[in-house]
Amino acid sequence: MSRKQSQKDSSGFIFDLQSNTVLAQGGTFENMKEKINAVRAIVPNKSNNEIILVLQHFDNCVDKTVQAFMEGSASEVLKEWIVTGKKKNKKKKSKPKPASEASGSAPDSSKSAPIQEEQPASSEKGSINGYHVNGAINDAESVDSLSEGLETLSIDARELEDPEFAAAETLDRTGSVLENGVSDFEPKSLTAHSISNVQQSRNAAKSLSRTTPGAQVSNLGMENVPLSSTNKKLGSNIEKSVKDLQRCTVSLARYRVVVKEEMDASIKKMKQAFAELQSCLMDREVALLAEMDKVKAEAMEILLSRQKKAELLKKMTDVAVRMSEEQLVELRADIKHFVSERKYDEDLGRVARFTCDVETLKQSIDSFGQVSHPKNSYSTRSRCSLVAPVSLSGPSDGSAASSSPDASVPSLPGANKRNCAPREASAAMTNSSDRPCQAHREVFPGNRRGGQGYRAQSQKTADPSNPGRHDSVGRYRNSSWYSSGPRYQGVPPQAPGNAGERSRPYSAGTNGTGAISEPSPPKPSFKKGLPQRKPRASQAEAANS
């Protein structure tokens, strides 16, 4: 394959001739690898290709790249790269073909398309790997080739996951090719029959999912894949959800770092608080010890003074022989006073001790400090697995159930024409018992309002968009007036093929697409039976005579 060479510049930028854009030059292998590793250290859930594309968009600036991944704007950058690749891919595919080869090479082109897509994908992988090995952008098509490879991989994965979608797409392609030489009705009928077959296979898968509830999730996963009309809308909704999920995961990593920082700060604060408490306790202990030393010194001083006074009194008792009576009385009174203060000596020995309320302090220490636990306000979403199967399987079952009586009712007039008289009489009795008011209205043919009501009702039933009113038509035609002989003497017998054609649209309605693919032809058949009003009047005159 020929590659377009890009103009290289020594200023660190590349001018792309194809897209007319200025791209940043990659640099050496070591610099690019260091930048990729720096971005990956902060954003670990991104691939090397995505990091390279975002680095290329921000001129190999690591800070802007990390900021783009953290804020979620990197997905917009990647989307821009993929859009350029899609435009180039469309240019490659649009090649003029002669009209004679278009009808003959339709299946060959459908087969060779994935082969042509796989060849550039393999060559593009080589160019990407060459970018990593050589360390610089060798080609201006490397980014576009990456987007094309991603697109082909996504298309192949979608075709593997949704074979029904692939079948419908191939049928659409063949229909578009056949439009040149064949009439427009055949591809439409082909697509209609293919869609009916697809819906039958879906109904079979739904019945299997009802019988086996264990495989219900997998069946729902296959049935939830829509056709190509709604696939783009669903993909855009999924893209928004993926962006939100990506932002949430990036913020979770940031919150994890915040939690670690908060834990470290709290532990540091706790250690600081207990260190202050320990220093306060030690200071208090030192103060109490100093206080005890003072108490001890005071008590010893008091006791020493008491000891000295006791020694003085003893000396005075030794010289009491030489004292006068008055001195003896004073000495006796001093000894008595000294002895009477002995209880204070005992109190002094008891008071000189340490007392404290340890239990209260322990309780206050136990309640000291609080740690706030994280509130788990997260809740699990209630699954809608009971609603999804009903919404998926309800319309098809309801349409089959509602179309089955409608398919059987319009064939009643043709069948009653061919039935024998006893069967018609029994049908008339049952219908007259079901609808007494209508039978009473038919007895009096002179009532013009009744005839007008019947005419309006019959015209309503001729409308194929109102299939629910065919039941009343069948009951009118099974009545006694319509089962009589003169009513249908002037009407030619209807061929069985016409009756089959009348019942075909309604029987095909069970598949869900027959009413759309084929026009409904019951209008002329009902108009043939409506204008015959004279036999009723002639029969009434014959009855009166």
UniProtKB/Swiss-Prot annotation:
Keywords: Cytoplasm, Phosphoprotein
Superkingdom, taxonomy of origin: Eukaryota
Pfam families in UniProt: SPATS2-like (PF07139)
InterPro entries: SPATS2-like (IPR009816), UBA-like_sf (IPR009060)
Chain intervals for the UniProt region annotation (Disordered): 87-133, 202-232, 390-545
Subcellular location: Cytoplasm
Low complexity bias locations: 97-107, 391-413
Modified residues (Phosphoserine): S142, S145, S147, S520
Cellular compartments per GO CC: cytoplasm; cytosol
Record's compositionally biased regions (Polar residues): 108-126, 455-464
Free-text tissue specificity from the UniProt record: Detected in testis, in spermatocytes and round spermatids (at protein level). Highly expressed in testis, and detected at lower levels in brain, heart, thymus, skeletal muscle, ovary, stomach and lung.
Broad class of where this protein is predominantly found: cytoplasm
Biased composition (Basic residues): 87-96
Protein family membership: Belongs to the SPATS2 family.
Matching PANTHER family: SPERMATOGENESIS-ASSOCIATED SERINE-RICH PROTEIN 2 (PTHR15623:SF10), SPERMATOGENESIS-ASSOCIATED SERINE-RICH PROTEIN 2-RELATED (PTHR15623)
Protein name: Spermatogenesis-associated serine-rich protein 2
UniProt source species: Mus musculus
